[in-house]
């Protein structure tokens, strides 16, 4: 580890920070696979639930006040995103892109009618994203490349509404509705044992989503809830499990 990075670690305190740039958040301390992303301006907590002692030659060398992990080629710290309570690992090399929060994150509240008024903008966000060159990115929540639930989260966040991160979490968070009750801006969920994919309903049986390379369109596209369309639409339709309506904005459980 460089002396500059060591200095950052030694002087970095646990607490709430704001992102000065778009940041990658990983699913393990090794920072090899993307879990999610934190857009510029988002808040995160550097967690502090235990102390980590590094040793050199069998003797304690330094004690850090928050969970860190030494991985091949770098180091990481455990974090939790404030807006959706999503946990992950941040590379210590990105510490310079954080600033301490002077004002803690406070979730906004919206009535169901206020959310309904914003749905045309939510839909417009996804359609604009589709017009840009993009591909499916596992863990992607920052344009131009998204995963399915990341696109949904970003679209609602664009109008100030927060929803959970993953498809199964979004399903549990939304108000269940029948497929026959679908309206523009509702969420449609796919998967067998649990929701593993999500899209945004448009109209006339069509929905917009970001799907993968192997079994999808490798990016954002519009498909139909029908067995009469192409193979990809049919494949997802066979996994259709339900629909949900966003009637509130997520409020973090962490205090």
Each model region followed by its residue ranges:
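Short, basic/aromatic beta-hairpin or loop at an interaction surface
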Residues: 10-25, 154-169, 203
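SH3/SH3-like beta-barrel superfamily modules
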Residues: 34-95
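...with weaker cross-activation on analogous glycine-rich loops/strands in unrelated enzymes
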Residues: 162-228
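Surface-exposed beta-loop interaction hotspot
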Residues: 97-135, 141
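Aromatic- and glycine-rich peptidoglycan recognition patches
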Residues: 15-24, 35, 202-255
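Catalytic cysteine-centered active-site loop
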Residues: 134-184
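Short, conserved secondary-structure segments in the cores of folded domains
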Residues: 33-34, 178
């Amino acid at each position: 580890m460089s002396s500059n990075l060591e200095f950052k670690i030694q002087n970095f305190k646990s607490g709430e920070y704001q992102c000065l740039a778009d940041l990658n958040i990983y699913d393990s301390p090794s920072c090899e696979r993307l879990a999610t992303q934190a857009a510029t301006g988002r808040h995160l907590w550097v967690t502090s639930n235990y102390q980590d002692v590094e040793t050199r030659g069998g003797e304690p060398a330094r004690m850090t006040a928050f969970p860190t992990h030494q991985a091949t080629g770098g180091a990481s710290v455990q974090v939790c995103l404030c807006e959706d309570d999503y946990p992950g690992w941040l590379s210590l090399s990105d510490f310079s892109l954080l600033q301490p929060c002077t004002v803690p994150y406070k979730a906004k509240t919206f009535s169901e009618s206020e959310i309904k008024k914003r749905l045309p903008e939510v839909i417009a966000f996804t359609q604009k994203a589709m017009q840009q060159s993009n591909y499916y990115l596992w863990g992607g929540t920052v344009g131009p490349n998204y995963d399915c639930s990341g696109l949904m989260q970003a679209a609602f966040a664009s109008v100030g509404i927060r929803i959970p991160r993953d498809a199964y979490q979004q399903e549990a968070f939304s108000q269940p509705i029948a497929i026959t009750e679908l309206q523009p801006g509702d969420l449609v969920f796919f998967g067998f044992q649990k929701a593993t994919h999500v899209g945004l309903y448009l109209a006339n049986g069509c929905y917009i989503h970001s799907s993968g390379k192997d079994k999808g369109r490798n990016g954002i596209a519009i498909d139909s809830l029908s067995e009469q369309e192409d193979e990809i639409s049919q494949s997802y339709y066979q996994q259709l499990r339900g629909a949900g309506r966003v009637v509130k904005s997520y409020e973090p459980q962490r205090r």
